[in-house]
């Protein structure tokens, strides 16, 4: 019998996964595990549960994607038992044993291909037209403060139309995740407005529904372990909860800001002290503490001068 492997997630990482909003924007300090434990589960879930789909990973440059984003994703997947060359391949045509994507890429050079036919295309803004002709079912936008929003809006967001006939029932079809630390310029602040789009009551209802599903499953497990019959009404109640959760997630926007201190258990106090010592006050406040400082139109912080 295979033993389940326990995986540690901090509170921001757990909440992001449990809420599972169709649009998720996480603004968090350095070393909070944005790529490793927020982006990696998001991409893996989409590729596993929408077999044959195509997703997009938007990065400022291919160099950034290949040296920062991609290694973080692959390292997390490896820890969770997904092996490069067995469960997925990168940058080459997948083996014949893999299922084929619903829409096959023209070129596999910047593509992650999964065994079930899902693939993720690395979309770099330093190469014009890298979103052209794509039909995407999800988008991951990494290092969003360096992303040109006009290019994203004109070239990439329209591609996130997905294939409704295959994946329309999933709340995460057309989903988008945006990750960054706190920007220091007006141009890099394009994603902060998502805070105003979030409905706190809807998010609270999702949290309550997730808990109620867990509580109901525990009750069913308890009855089964005692070899007692599980009432039909309880099974029906669980199905209704799942349907309601799926509907709420499909329209939800989740926006959160976190400082690096949220990951203190792994980072340790010395890391925070070292960053305070080594970074400029402005960079420490934005990149570690994730604090918003008023940004003037010229791109400089209006309430602070270094």
Residue ranges, per PLM feature:
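Conserved P-loop
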Residues: 24-93
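Inter-Walker segment of RecA-like/P-loop motor cores
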Residues: 66-135
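Alpha-helical scaffold elements adjacent to nucleotide-binding pockets in ATP/GTP-utilizing enzyme cores
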Residues: 41, 68-76, 151-159, 190-194, ...
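Catalytic P-loop NTPase motifs of RecA-like helicase/translocase cores
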Residues: 32-33, 65, 131, 147-150, ...
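Signature of the SF2 helicase/ATPase Hel1-core->accessory helical subdomain module
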Residues: 141-250, 257-260
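Conserved nucleotide-binding/hydrolysis micro-motifs of P-loop NTPases
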Residues: 62-64, 127, 182-186, 262-265
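Pre-Walker A adenine-sensing motif
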Residues: 2-21
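ATPase catalytic-site recognition across NTP-hydrolyzing enzymes
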Residues: 225-239, 247-251, 257-306
